[in-house]
Amino acid sequence: MPSHKSFMIKKKLGKKMRQNRPIPHWIRLRTDNTIRYNAKRRHWRRTKLGF
């Protein structure tokens, strides 16, 4: 990835960075909760973004 990024690429990278985090702990504590972890976590070396 070049150091001079276009704004659109930078915006997409920022969104993917925000998506790639664990779920908040208080969500796990809610009643009738089935979500245990973020199924869409992405590792930077295993799965590439494709742009």
From Swiss-Prot:
PROSITE patterns in alphabetical order: RIBOSOMAL_L39E
Gene Ontology CC: cytosolic large ribosomal subunit; plasma membrane; vacuole
Disordered: annotated segments: 1-21
Key words, A-Z: Ribonucleoprotein, Ribosomal protein
InterPro entries for this protein: Ribosomal_eL39, Ribosomal_eL39_CS, Ribosomal_eL39_dom_sf
Biased composition (Basic residues): 7-19
GO biological process: translation
Disulphide bonds in the chain: none
Pfam families assigned: Ribosomal_L39 (PF00832)
Single annotated GO MF: mRNA binding
Top-level taxon in the UniProt lineage: Eukaryota
Protein family (similarity comment): Belongs to the eukaryotic ribosomal protein eL39 family.
PANTHER family: LARGE RIBOSOMAL SUBUNIT PROTEIN EL39, RIBOSOMAL PROTEIN L39E
Protein name: Large ribosomal subunit protein eL39z/eL39x
Origin species: Arabidopsis thaliana (Mouse-ear cress)
Gene that produces this protein: RPL39A
